[in-house]
């Protein structure tokens, strides 16, 4: 990953420090909408991989495992796998009233819960808007879902 800079178009580029990385995420949610139009979700499944080193050759057949239920206590759990609430990566959707609303990811679902939403996210930069590494590149081709 490249060094993180901030560039919003209104000021000079500023070096922030740290490294920016590509990320691939598969998130399964169980969503519902309340009477006020707020959209809520439980995290059913999580498969997130940060690509923290250069991969010079094309990789065929790469797999990202999806883990079900509450994974926060697992030894391999990383902070970037957390629920998306109050983070720069919060998700939004159009509710039944036609408004763009933030999705409130309230907790972890039981591992046997049936999801009703699949999110697949490919990011060349895993930081918030206007922060990133100049030169980060992520090539994606032929995505396949295996059930």
Which residues are covered by each model-predicted region?
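Extracellular carbohydrate recognition
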Residues: 111-114, 126-147
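Short helix-terminating capping/connector loops at secondary-structure junctions
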Residues: 17-20, 110-115
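Residues that flank catalytic or metal-binding motifs in active/ligand-binding sites
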Residues: 20-24, 60, 134-141
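One-face residue pattern on beta-strands with alternating periodicity enriched for small/polar residues
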Residues: 23-27, 61-65, 119-123
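Extracellular-facing segments of soluble proteins and assemblies that are Gly/Ser/Thr-biased and enriched
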Residues: 1-34
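Extracellular carbohydrate recognition and processing domains
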Residues: 33-112, 133
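Solvent-exposed residues in well-ordered beta-strands and their adjoining turns
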Residues: 3, 29, 67-69, 146
């Amino acid at each position: 990953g490249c060094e993180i800079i901030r560039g919003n178009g209104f000021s000079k580029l500023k070096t922030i420090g740290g490294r920016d990385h590509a990320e691939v995420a598969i998130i399964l949610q169980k969503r519902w909408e309340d009477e006020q139009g707020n959209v809520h979700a439980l995290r059913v499944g999580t498969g997130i991989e940060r690509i923290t080193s250069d991969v010079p050759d094309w990789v065929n057949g790469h797999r990202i495992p999806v883990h079900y239920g509450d994974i926060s206590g697992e030894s391999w759990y990383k902070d970037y796998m957390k629920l998306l609430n109050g983070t720069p990566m919060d998700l939004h959707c159009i509710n039944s009233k036609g408004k763009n609303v933030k999705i409130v990811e309230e907790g972890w679902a039981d591992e046997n819960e049936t999801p009703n939403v699949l999110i697949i996210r490919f990011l060349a930069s895993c930081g918030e808007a206007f922060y990133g590494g100049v030169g980060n590149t992520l090539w994606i081709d032929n995505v396949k879902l295996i059930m």
